């Protein structure tokens, strides 16, 4: 996590346990090489660097003995007669190879929160990615954005910081604060100067055009979220009045167990009062937050802030982060951004991996294994960009079916010049996405999670692939052909017995 500062999100260590040693991380896999069986420990906690009461390690291993350490609780957190939730520990077992190992982990992760197509699947647009901050958001701007978003096939339009009466520290119009939010009882009401009729016109147009309106929200951080009940009521009030049920939760800081417990109370209360209809997009970009393995029952993860303005959006970087995480975190629980490639082209002058060197369709394709996030203003797109709507409409037809499977990385790690991709495994069927980055080879042999020496039918769904029947090679290898660099294809596959 802390993706504002980190761009390498997964680290793997492979050891033969010997004398007693400590290891850091959220996951430990242990395999018995004699019989091919194994177990895993999942520590349901933030990343090691931001855990509470951290003792310097998460696991100890000594020959065949393994221990999970670090409850995230000290004696100061205990209150007589009150239960205190420690960090969770999941123990799982498997038999077989790496696919069985990862499937065992994923079967638990997928059951933490049922992925409902009408609630959890989304192709979201959030205008903050164009760096206008809160200078543009008002009724007129949002109505225009919703119309264009509908043309693009967007399902959810999220109004970020600036819709509300209160001003945050990130405001470009009047520097505000997150401290003592409830000194202003109207802080979380629509700004009457920007939205004189409230959010009703925007919400109603969205319903008419099939675009769900979503909002940004920053819980009241002071005194360990002591005002969590007021925050919960504000969110429930927005749900009751406008039907808004998807909220980006930003600005979290969890310095102690009381803060963590009150945040859970906030999330639980909102889900209880809305019949489980609300989705929280939990921002993982900064601060002491939940990370990839905590609060997963509440929604999905807003993964990263990337901007062409600061030249830190590279399509292959975004693809790489999704590819690396997808082995251990459900890809369908990650919001993955694509940006307006026509902005700030001069800042990437001469850079072969500049966003402008890719088709807009390819940028969208890099997000398809996750929950796509159009991190941009629709009004800033040129006319040629609107053609992506046909691709997004076709993607939405298979989005949930793709996300139902166990999504795992295939091919080589994205580097800007690799053959790479994803596989969604669902029994004897599933999907494959292949990317030919700026690689000179028209064809590649790519290892997959398919069984060896098996006949498989490949049916193109999106992109540039051609229908084929192949027999897999060693490690499930398939031969893939794409006619040009920076191209992609999505196949539906089925094993032929």
Which residues does each predicted region cover?
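Active-site-proximal substrate-binding groove within the catalytic cores of carbohydrate-active enzymes
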Residues: 82, 86, 267-469, 481-483, ...
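An acidic-aromatic substrate-binding cleft motif
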Residues: 100-148, 152-156, 160, 165
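Short, glycine-/Ser/Thr-/acidic-enriched flexible segments
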Residues: 46, 130, 220, 437-439, ...
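Aromatic- and carboxylate-enriched substrate-binding clefts and catalytic-loop regions
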Residues: 158-346, 357
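C-terminal engagement modules used by replication, chromatin/transcription, nuclear envelope/ESCRT
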Residues: 176, 487-494
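Short beta-strand-to-coil "C-cap" segments at the C-terminal boundary of structured domains/repeats
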Residues: 92-94, 492-497
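N-terminal accessory beta-strand-rich subdomains and adjacent acidic, glycine-rich linkers
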Residues: 1-106, 445-448, 455-456, 462-482
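A short, polar/charged loop/turn motif at coil->beta-strand junctions and beta-hairpin connectors
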Residues: 5, 117-121, 426, 452
């Amino acid at each position: 996590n802390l993706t504002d500062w980190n761009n390498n999100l997964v680290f793997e260590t492979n050891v033969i346990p010997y004398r007693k040693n400590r290891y850091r991380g959220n996951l430990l896999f242990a395999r018995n090489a004699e019989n091919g069986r194994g177990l895993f420990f999942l520590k349901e906690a933030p990343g090691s660097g931001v855990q509470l009461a951290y003792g310097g390690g998460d696991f100890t291993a000594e020959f065949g003995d393994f221990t999970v350490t670090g409850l995230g609780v000290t004696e100061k957190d205990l209150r007589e007669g009150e239960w205190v939730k420690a960090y969770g520990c999941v123990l799982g077992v498997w038999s077989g190879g790496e696919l069985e190992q990862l499937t065992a982990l994923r079967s638990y992760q997928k059951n933490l929160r049922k992925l409902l197509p009408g609630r959890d699947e989304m192709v979201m647009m959030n205008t903050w990615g164009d760096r206008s901050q809160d200078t543009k958001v008002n009724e007129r701007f949002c109505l225009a954005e919703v119309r264009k978003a509908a043309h693009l096939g967007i399902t959810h339009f999220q109004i970020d910081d600036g819709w509300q009466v209160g001003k945050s520290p990130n405001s470009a119009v009047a520097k505000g604060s997150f401290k003592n939010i409830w000194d202003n009882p109207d802080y979380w009401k629509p700004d009457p100067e920007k939205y004189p009729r409230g959010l009703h016109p925007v919400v109603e147009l969205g319903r008419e055009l099939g675009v769900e309106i979503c909002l940004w929200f920053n819980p009241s951080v002071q005194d360990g979220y002591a005002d969590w009940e007021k925050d919960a009521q504000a969110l429930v009030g927005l749900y009751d009045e406008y039907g808004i049920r998807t909220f980006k939760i930003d600005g979290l800081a969890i310095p102690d167990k009381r803060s963590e417990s009150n945040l859970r109370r906030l999330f639980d209360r909102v889900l209880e009062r809305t019949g489980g209809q609300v989705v929280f997009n939990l921002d993982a970009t900064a601060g002491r937050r939940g990370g990839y393995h905590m609060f997963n029952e509440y929604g999905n993860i807003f993964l990263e802030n990337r901007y062409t303005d600061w030249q830190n959006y590279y399509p292959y970087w975004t693809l790489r982060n999704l590819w690396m995480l997808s082995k251990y975190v459900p890809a369908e629980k990650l919001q993955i951004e694509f940006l307006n490639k026509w902005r700030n082209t001069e800042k990437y002058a001469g850079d072969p991996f500049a966003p402008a060197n890719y088709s807009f369709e390819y940028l969208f394709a890099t997000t398809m294994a996750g929950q796509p996030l159009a991190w941009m203003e629709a009004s800033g797109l040129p006319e040629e960009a609107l053609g992506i709507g046909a691709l997004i409409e076709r993607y939405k037809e298979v989005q949930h079916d793709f996300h139902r499977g166990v999504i795992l990385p295939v091919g080589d790690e994205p580097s800007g010049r690799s053959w790479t991709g994803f596989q969604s495994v669902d029994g004897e069927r599933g999907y494959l996405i292949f990317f030919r980055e700026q690689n000179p080879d028209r064809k590649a042999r790519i290892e997959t999670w398919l069984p060896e020496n098996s006949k498989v039918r490949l049916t193109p769904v999106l992109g540039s692939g051609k229908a084929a029947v192949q027999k897999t090679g060693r490690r499930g290898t398939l031969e893939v052909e794409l006619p040009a660099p920076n191209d992609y294809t999505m196949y539906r596959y089925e094993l032929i017995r």
